[in-house]
């Protein structure tokens, strides 16, 4: 794989803003901590407002800084919506696979995302907490069907066990890079409406069922 972690002294070729969205307590902050710092805190408190972390990596010999934004899922923090989505070239829709309601809310979150972000933003559906297989409330097939219908990537993860977390982030970042490098555009190119135009006209391919794991475990790209 050509994805390697970059040197902080390297020139940054691209900055990709990726947002994490979904209900509270689905593990967005834990996913971010696992990817950015390889940490997991059992006592993680609910995010208040907005925070972001960065990680530098190398894709196809280019240095990419991933700027991952995390926000609280509670309704009272929704005032940050416009600024939160502005400039995002990727998004992760996160639900808790042990809580059906968090998955049922994905359509609402996706609608909000598409209402504020570029219409061709790269989106991945994430079913988190797949380490709790005995408590599964969302069959993998339901999530795959939703992802297929909405043209999203899909992966099941465990921030606790670090299952598929790095793979999920690298998949979405590599797809963003592939699109941008193909179009020879920079990450801050805006159209007349102030939306990133990097991803327009791009078809997103989700992982095939052959690449997915069994229903009882964590599903994702191999």
Curated annotation (Swiss-Prot):
It is a lipid-anchor. Disruption phenotype: Defects in pollen tube growth and altered deposition of cell wall components. Interacts with PI4KB1. It comes from Arabidopsis thaliana. InterPro entries: P-loop_NTPase, Rab_GTPases_membrane_traffic, Small_GTP-bd, Small_GTPase. A lipid is attached at residues 218-219 (S-geranylgeranyl cysteine). Its main location: membrane. GO terms for cellular component: apical part of cell; cytoplasmic vesicle membrane; cytosol; exocytic vesicle; pollen tube tip. PROSITE patterns: RAB. GO terms for biological process: pollen tube development; pollen tube growth; protein transport; regulation of pollen tube growth. Belongs to the small GTPase superfamily. Rab family. This is Ras-related protein RABA4d. The gene is RABA4D. One of its GO terms (molecular function) is GTP binding. It comes from the Eukaryota. Keywords: Cytoplasmic vesicle, GTP-binding, Lipoprotein, Membrane, Nucleotide-binding, Prenylation, Protein transport, Transport. GTP binds at residues 22-29, 70-74, 128-131, 158-159. It is found in: Cytoplasmic vesicle membrane. A motif (Effector region) lies at residues 44-52. Gene3D superfamilies: P-loop containing nucleotide triphosphate hydrolases (3.40.50.300). Intracellular vesicle trafficking and protein transport. Plays an important role in the regulation of pollen tube tip growth. SUPFAM superfamilies: P-loop containing nucleoside triphosphate hydrolases (SSF52540). Specifically expressed in pollen and localized to the tips of growing pollen tubes.
